[in-house]
Swiss-Prot record:
A molecular-function term among this protein's GO annotations: quinone binding
InterPro entries from the UniProt entry: PQQD, PqqD_bac, PqqD_sf
Subunit structure: Monomer. Interacts with PqqE.
Statement: the UniProt record of this protein carries the keyword Cell division: no
Disulphide-bonded residues: none
Keyword Coiled coil: no
Metabolic or biological pathway: Cofactor biosynthesis; pyrroloquinoline quinone biosynthesis
One Gene Ontology term from the biological process aspect of the record: pyrroloquinoline quinone biosynthetic process
Annotated keywords: PQQ biosynthesis
Identification of the protein by name: PqqA binding protein 1
Stated role: Functions as a PqqA binding protein and presents PqqA to PqqE, in the pyrroloquinoline quinone (PQQ) biosynthetic pathway.
């Protein structure tokens, strides 16, 4: 089954993506705690706005990182993990 890049990701209610100086990086805050995101997840997370579809996020990051062939696959993997962990909803 292929990933539908026309889906629009949005953070679930109660989840907030932000930079946390104490963690020296981006985190995902939620009522029960916090998840520290790695650099690539932070780049993807920064583009999740409830407006852009996955294809637009891929396009944006492919422009920022030309010549990196796995960008699209990495973004799809992030979306699948984030959905499985209930961080995002895909509509």
């Amino acid at each position: 089954m292929s990933f539908d890049r026309n889906q629009v990701p949005n953070w679930r209610p109660g989840y907030r993506f932000q930079y946390e100086p104490a963690q020296k990086g981006h985190v995902l805050l939620y009522p029960e705690g916090m998840i520290k995101l790695n650099d690539s997840a932070s780049l993807i997370g920064g583009l999740i706005d409830g407006q852009r579809d996955v294809a637009a996020i891929i396009s944006e990051l492919e422009q920022q990182f030309p010549g990196v062939p796995e960008v699209a696959d990495d973004i799809e993997q992030f979306m699948e993990v984030a959905r499985a962990e209930h961080w995002i909803v895909l509509a």
